[in-house]
């Protein structure tokens, strides 16, 4: 990852930490999509951005999309992201943390996901990752 992008990631994580979790605005899915857009790619969340404001609305969209993995894969395709088996800081993925599947940003061995604040942990499993 280029030096400028490292600095941008640091600033982005600070912003992630300071903003409350809000379904349809700053949830784990849209936060990762925001990072992808900030990194210069098309918006992977464009088809559903602004279409939900509650946890129930989010769950309905995820279910309609065929699950979070299918939803993220289509978003990665829209943003022209390539799948990677060796994620680097700044890459994104679907990870399993504490038994939950979360959209997250790679920090190295740990990943950051939007919760109430930011959850930073080593995932139990990297389900799929994409190069940003």
Regions found by a protein language model. Name each.
Residues 56-119:
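...with weaker cross-activation on analogous glycine-rich loops/strands in unrelated enzymes
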Residues 121-132:
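Glycine- and charge-enriched low-complexity intrinsically disordered segments
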Residues 1-62:
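N-terminal capping segments
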Residues 43-46, 86, 122:
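Intrinsic-disorder/low-complexity coil detector
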């Amino acid at each position: 990852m280029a030096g400028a992008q490292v600095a941008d990631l640091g600033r982005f994580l600070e912003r992630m930490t300071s903003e409350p979790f809000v379904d349809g605005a700053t949830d784990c899915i849209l936060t990762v999509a925001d990072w992808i857009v900030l990194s210069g790619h098309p918006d992977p969340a464009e088809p559903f951005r602004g279409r939900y404001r509650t946890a129930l609305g989010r769950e309905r969209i995820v279910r309609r999309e065929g699950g979070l993995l299918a939803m993220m894969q289509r978003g990665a395709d829209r943003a022209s992201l390539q799948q990677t088996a060796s994620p680097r800081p700044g890459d994104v993925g679907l990870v399993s943390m504490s038994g939950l599947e979360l959209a997250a940003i790679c920090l190295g061995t740990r990943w950051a996901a939007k919760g109430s604040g930011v959850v930073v942990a080593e995932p139990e499993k990297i389900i799929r990752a994409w190069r940003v």
